[in-house]
């Protein structure tokens, strides 16, 4: 009897191996209007990274995570209007955030994302205190699917190799 045991990569891979990086957080002091322009501009303003993600971490002066802001937030503010003097930090204060850590297992984070129906999660490097933790990446559902797709490709390649070996062995008899 031949039995194969498969190791689930979600249970051995660390988040650091699957997260998108580098992260370009937005400062909490940025005005709402500037954030709307960032998300809606066809090209990035001079000296800034292009808005290629759907959401970004918002950090304080000490680079501590305080919120996440999304393109959907910016579009909602465009439609409903916004206080031109309000900052991202003021607008997003009290946001309930799901975070991950770079040393965490991908499977644990995927479970928490599924339970919270979270599409994107900021990833932190652990500091001595929560305030000292810094944002080092983002994990989106597509990053988790990429891990799963890699496993499927490896399994398909392995099956083809086994079939080829079986065919070669049958010819030699």
Identify the meaning behind each predicted range.
Residues 10-20, 29-35, 84-92, 103-109:
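Short, structural beta-strand-to-alpha-helix junction motif
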Residues 1-27, 151-173:
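Membrane-interfacial segments at transmembrane helix termini in multi-pass membrane proteins
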Residues 66-74, 136-144:
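Short hydrophobic beta-strand motif reused across regulatory alpha/beta modules
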Residues 58, 64-65:
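Anionic-ligand-binding alpha/beta catalytic cores of soluble enzymes and soluble regulatory domains
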Residues 26-52, 59, 76-81, 99-127, ...:
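The conserved cystathionine-beta-synthase
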Residues 56-57, 69:
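ABC-type nucleotide-binding domain
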Residues 95:
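A conserved mid-domain beta-alpha-beta active-site/ligand-binding segment of alpha/beta enzyme cores
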């Amino acid at each position: 009897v031949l039995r194969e045991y498969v190791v689930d990569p979600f249970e051995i891979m660390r988040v650091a191996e699957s997260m998108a990086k580098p992260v370009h957080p937005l400062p909490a002091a940025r005005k709402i209007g500037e954030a709307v322009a960032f998300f809606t501009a066809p090209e990035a303003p001079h000296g800034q990274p292009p808005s290629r993600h759907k959401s970004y971490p918002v950090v304080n002066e000490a680079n501590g995570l305080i919120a996440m802001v999304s393109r959907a937030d910016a579009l909602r503010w465009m439609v409903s209007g916004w206080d031109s003097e309000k900052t991202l930090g003021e607008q997003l204060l009290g946001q309930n955030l799901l975070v991950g850590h770079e040393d965490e297992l991908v499977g644990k984070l995927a479970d928490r994302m599924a339970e919270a129906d979270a599409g994107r999660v900021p990833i932190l490097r652990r500091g001595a205190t929560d305030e000292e933790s810094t944002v080092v990446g983002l994990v989106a559902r597509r990053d988790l699917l990429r891990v799963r797709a890699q496993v499927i490709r490896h399994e398909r390649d392995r099956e083809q190799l086994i079939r080829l070996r079986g065919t070669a062995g049958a010819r030699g008899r």
